[in-house]
Amino acid sequence: APALLCALFACGMQIAANFINDLYDYLKGSDRADRLGPERACAQGWITPTAMKRGIAGMLIFSCLIGCTLLQQCWGQLPHGGWGLILLGLLCVIFAFLYTTLLSYKGWGDLLVLVFFGFIPVGGTYYVQAHSITADVWVASFICGLVIDTLLVVNNYRDREQDALSGKRTLIVRFGEPFGRYLY
């Protein structure tokens, strides 16, 4: 059951982060008409910013309820109770906002993907089941984070010109197209 709860928490947080990204890129004007990639709900007028904020709140509440259920199941079995899980959950919520509102525009996207799609979900899921972390788990977490980061890299490569115009300083915008090909 802890692994399923971890998966539900991760899915809920991913949906919340996608909603936050859609809303704040729209509010910042990053989702222009010449944008490549999938259409965005706020930019297309399919959903109002107010409704998107409600969706964000709903997904965060859902994720926090899942997190509380996980804590209830694991509390007392983990070293230090479950305080580490509380900290990880809070970091997930905080960085879901910071990623789009600030950090992705400053070139921190790749590092954050490595942490929040590698170390936290893989290491966290292992930890709540085994009650410890091993070097193998750190390696597996790192590899999973790198695999997921290739999706960000390919999107940033595709969007490099629009990102530059929007003020997004991704690694590919900073270091150029040849670097992007190498990074991928």
Regions picked out by a protein language model, each given a short descriptive name:
Residues 113-160, 166, 179:
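Functional transmembrane core segments of multi-pass inner-membrane proteins
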Residues 20-61, 145-184:
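Solvent-exposed interhelical
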Residues 22, 26-30, 72-79, 101-105, ...:
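Transmembrane helix-loop junctions in multipass membrane proteins, especially transporters and channels
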Residues 38-132:
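Intramembrane alpha-helical segments
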Residues 3, 18-32, 77-88, 101-105, ...:
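Phosphate-binding glycine-rich loops and adjacent basic patches that engage nucleotide phosphates
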